[in-house]
Amino acid sequence: MKKTLSLFIALLAAIAVSAQDVSIEFITPRIVHIVKGKPTKSLVVTAQKQDVPLVKKPGSISSSELTVRLNEKTGCVTFLTRKGKLLLREKSHDVSKVQQTFTLDKGEAVYGLGTFQNGKMNRRGEKKRMEQSNLEDFQSVLQSIKGWGLYWENYSPTVFEDNADGMSFTSEAGEGIDYYFMWGGSADGVIAQMRQLTGDVPMFPLWTYGFWQSKERYKSSRELLAVVDKYRELQVPLDGIIQDWQYWGSNYLWNAMDFLTEDFSNGRRMIDEVHRKNAHFMISIWASFGPMTQQFRELDAKGLLLPIETWPQSGLTFWPPRMEYPSGVKVYDAFSSEARDIYWKYLKRLYSYGTDAWWMDSTDPDFFNPRESDYTHPVTGGTWRSLRNAFPLATVRGVYEAQRKEADNKKRVFIMTRSSFAGQQHYGSNMWSGDVASSWDMLRKQVPAGLSFSLTGNPNFNTDIGGFFCGSYNTMGGGSAPRNPQYQELFVRWMQYGLFCPVFRSHGADAPREIWQFGKKGEPVYDAIEKQIRLRYRFIPYLYSTAWQVTTNNASYLRPLFSDFASDAAVWDMTDEFMFGSSILAAPVLEAQYTKEQIIREDAMTGWDKKEVKAESPQGAIDWSAQKSVKKYLPKGAEWYDFWTGARYKGGQWLTITTQLDRVPMFVRAGSILPFAPEMQYVGEKDWSSLELRVYPGADASFTLYEDEGDGYNYEKGICSEIPMTWNDRSRTLTIGGRKGQFPGMLSQRTFTVILPDGKSQTVSYSGEEVRCKM
């Protein structure tokens, strides 16, 4: 039975809709598709419409979860729960525009839309023109503290505005209003609905949860390999090494997708060496090509290049750019399946060398000095304007789908991308927040930016640890920022935020960022950095098990506090604390405590005023051992343990916490089980035959330890294992349940050491059968 209502059969009651068609279609009992005019040809939606039982009455239609009403005079739609609770309603609008206005409750908080770099969570009172860029990425997905979500299905630049007249979306192109309303009941519930609509999240390789080192850029294979060697010599953990741009040589050969300089004379051998050192290799690729590349010539001959001005603008590699020598670099039409096939045909060469992961830079793409003729230029399926914001989705999807089709593919696709659009979580990508400035203000902005991004349904977010542009700290000469105490403190605190991101990656320009640039072992800054890296590796069983929950149960890594504590209004706009998975409350220090923080300007390309920074540079040694303090909030509805001290606190209170340089404040929710791995130099150096299980009493708890082969897609066939664990708080008993499933290389025997916050511990042997541990 068709579930679409239109002007012609509207609710079987001949409702007039002011000369416009209104289509109301239930995709699932909790997802409703609204169209006025012509629908968008979707690049995002993957869900198949379910056969949803409906109850129709004059002026309304209901599923088991939602009721939708249609005003017969105005054509406006209202959404309610099946029990009649008002969720959201439309207002009348100008039918000559691709625009819809909605009425929100007074004080109703709304979230999402992507990575706004304004330091806010709640979107009330904001006006923003949403067009993909380096620093801000937009997914037209919004959700409310009331538990509903909305996906605006339009790919053109769109203005979001909330004011006294209502909340509206106004798009620059389109033939109709097209959006999906979702009822989730909570933040996690809305995310689950969005993924049901646009696709689930595939697993990433286990090794990607280790530490990554990068910089702009390693200038030879010798330099890159020496970095891996140095980490191994220092016995500091490392899993990923990244080669940034220009390994191809001239800008006229931009993105040739091959090693074309003497400094990278044998790319395959270099990658083999990385693998022999038990590390993995990621390489930078772009969505544009220089005029001397094979890709440019083939795409140009087929009319599959765009005329927009992009990076690099100069054909010379000098800085600043010499514009009298234009590069001729052009962006490819990623909306064309033929163009995407050509892209992979040449990228496959790097894949054949053994590349483990892709760094898809400038997937926005860079778009300078835009002209009206650029926006009206035809691309496959529309115009540049009509499809503009979906470009990152199209190019990332092309690489993901092509690699998945490779017959010998034993590697999970891992793509790091600078931009993202709705539904991109389905295509093996993790988005970083762009070329952010190295400042405390920008660090503070990354927390709400990452949370807002996660609320759109894509859980995979990271940042350039330390910020990309740190040149203002080079007060003692070129590349000296890591010796500047102001930058040292910022870098350590950024590392502590990065500890909680799905990808833990140090990168940037203006100065190298390897750990030894900041000092040597035994010195406070070096030791603080090393401590964060080592802690990350201990967290990996928790992280990887969370990844499984992300894939199978629509969980998230970075979760705003209102995800679990929506009844506590104090956390509705919390921008400096968040949940890391389901159990850990991360409360990183986001202000300078040992050095001065005077911000002169916030321009992402220049950062701080260099003269002022030099004047502010501390004179004399910094006492990094001094204890400081910071105020943090513990939400109502749970009790909390200080991760470091084991002290227990009630929720609903502000605490003044003693801090030190090498510790990031964090708390564990009472009623949690956390698995900890042994220390290791790289993922896989040691197996998980001996794990710690830290149990935090105060409530019943459950956790599922997930394991598989660590790479490849056999998990999609059920080749993996789960070990369920439960804590009964009344009996103080931990039950480690019988293992479910198996995979090649699975451990047959292991030990778990159960540890309580008061230090009591007990070690148990486990061979796959249920065991109980009474504490």
Predicted features, each with a name:
Residues 89, 239-529, 564-566, 574:
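Aromatic- and carboxylate-enriched substrate-binding clefts and catalytic-loop regions
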Residues 220-233, 340-348:
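Short, acidic/polar
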Residues 10-18:
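Hydrophobic h-region of N-terminal signal peptides that target proteins for export
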Residues 21, 31, 67, 140-141, ...:
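Beta-sheet entry/capping signal
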Residues 1, 18-208, 214-216, 220-229, ...:
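N-terminal accessory segment at the very beginning of proteins
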Residues 2-10:
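Sec-dependent signal peptide recognition
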Residues 401-405, 413, 420-431, 453-463, ...:
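Catalytic core of carbohydrate-active enzymes
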Residues 72-74, 134-136, 145, 174-176, ...:
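Short, solvent-exposed loop/turn segments at the edges of secondary structure
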